[in-house]
Regions:
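A glycine-rich dinucleotide-binding beta-alpha-beta segment and adjacent secondary-structure elements
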Residues: 297-323
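N-terminal Rossmann-like NAD(P) cofactor-binding subdomain of oxidoreductases
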Residues: 19-217, 253-255, 279, 288, ...
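Short hydrophobic/aromatic beta-strand micro-patches
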Residues: 274-276
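Oxyanion-binding "anion nests"
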Residues: 220-266
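Short, conserved charged micro-motifs
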Residues: 279-287, 348-349
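Conserved glycine-rich beta-strand-loop-beta hairpin in the small C-terminal domain of fold type I
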Residues: 266-272
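A common structural junction motif
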Residues: 285, 290-300
Length: 366
């Protein structure tokens, strides 16, 4: 129902991140495999590679047996979907995974053993000390440390950290509080369909029983649909953001508090972010840093009450940042609050992965 929306919203390119010279055994026109090609992120892998001019010698579309024999479109040609097996990677240079943690844990090592470099969108390897966890705007230099697998961070972490990083570089952030407003796209195509269908049923006065989400989705919001740690009270999504922030920033001392909420929005996550720096920080300083930060676009019009919104972030590569203001609860002048929005399927997933793949060897891009 909403699958066409995935590609239709992929329109605007972000500022280019200039690749550094990196020695990798990847050909100029690599064979690229996509695992999970029929999913929401898989569709965006294809669209993102196409519009960014990513050179591909051959595309291998991999999915489960039930999708085998179907086709996907790539650069005007139909590519037949193959069933994912242990022999799928024999001739592959780069593999983009977005089929869930269990699939990644089983097949990513097989792909690496066959000679492929893996960029994995699941949480399977993110906290493995030997696996780089990369946001290219922040730590592209870590790509060269890979041993075959590079992890794509959590979408909520990416959304917050891209604009926080330039501030952290100039004035160390010692504490950050994040409250998320996460769209259906983060739970996949089936969740997006359920939001549309349940909204229609609700408007027509019909009963709708949730099949994907744990609670009614239309005109409702609820705590992120991941398991709750009975001791801390934090859900898995919140814990991921905390741990990944520290790993990506390479700062175990940074204090992170997170509350993750699922909202009835089709696509694009929003987050309220308040951070405290070691030294005093002003709104003007933050604006100046963000104005030249790669992957960031300031949307902050107080006169018109116009700030980042999901409808504007959908299809955008940049993280939108607005509501930049002093945190009045901190009289020391060390804290700033802001509101951010980003397309979860793009910068939160597919775009970030493709940016990583672009940086493997400089010669991958024309």
């Amino acid at each position: 129902m909403v699958r066409g929306f995935f590609v239709a919203c992929s329109m605007v390119r972000s500022r280019e991140i200039m690749p550094k010279e990196m020695e990798q055994n990847v050909s100029n026109d690599p064979v690229v495999a996509i695992v999970g090609v029929t999913g929401a992120v898989g569709a965006e892998f294809i669209a993102t590679m196409d519009r960014r001019g990513f050179r591909v010698g051959k595309l291998k579309a991999l999915a489960s047996a039930r999708s085998s024999g179907k086709t996907v479109s790539f650069r005007g040609e139909r590519v037949v979907i193959e069933e994912l097996t242990e022999h799928s990677f024999d001739d592959v240079d780069i593999t983009l995974f977005s089929a869930g943690g269990s699939i990644s844990r089983k097949f990513a090592p097989i792909a690496v053993k066959a000679g492929a470099v893996v960029v994995d969108n699941s949480s399977a390897f993110r906290m493995d000390p030997s696996v780089p966890l990369v946001i290219p705007e922040i730590n592209a230099n870590r790509i060269r440390d890979h041993k075959g697998i590079i992890a794509n961070p959590n979408c909520a972490a990416i959304t917050a950290l891209v604009p926080l990083w330039p501030i952290h570089q100039k004035n160390r952030i010692k504490r950050v509080i994040i409250s998320t407003y996460q769209a259906a796209s983060g739970a996949g195509a089936a969740a997006m369909d359920e939001l549309v269908e349940s909204t229609r049923a609700n408007l027509n006065g019909q009963l709708y029983t949730p099949k994907v989400m744990p609670h009614p989705y239309a005109f409702n919001l609820f705590s992120h649909n991941t398991a709750i740690d009975p001791e801390t009270g934090y859900n898995d999504e919140e814990t991921k953001v905390i741990k990944e922030t520290r790993k990506i920033f390479e700062d175990d001392r940074i204090a992170v508090g997170v509350t993750c909420v699922r909202v009835p929005v089709l696509r694009a996550h929003c987050e309220a972010v308040t951070f405290e720096c070691e030294k005093p920080v002003s709104e003007d300083q933050v604006r100046s840093l963000l104005a030249v930060a790669p992957g960031v676009k300031i949307v902050d019009d107080r006169a018109k009450n116009y700030f980042p919104m999901p409808v504007d972030a959908s299809g955008q590569d940049d993280v939108l940042v607005g509501r930049i203001r002093k945190d009045l609860s901190d009289p020391s002048g060390h804290s700033i609050s802001m509101f951010v929005a980003a397309d979860q399927l793009l910068k939160g997933a597919a775009l970030n992965a493709v940016q990583i793949a672009e940086l493997l060897p400089e010669r991958v891009m024309a």
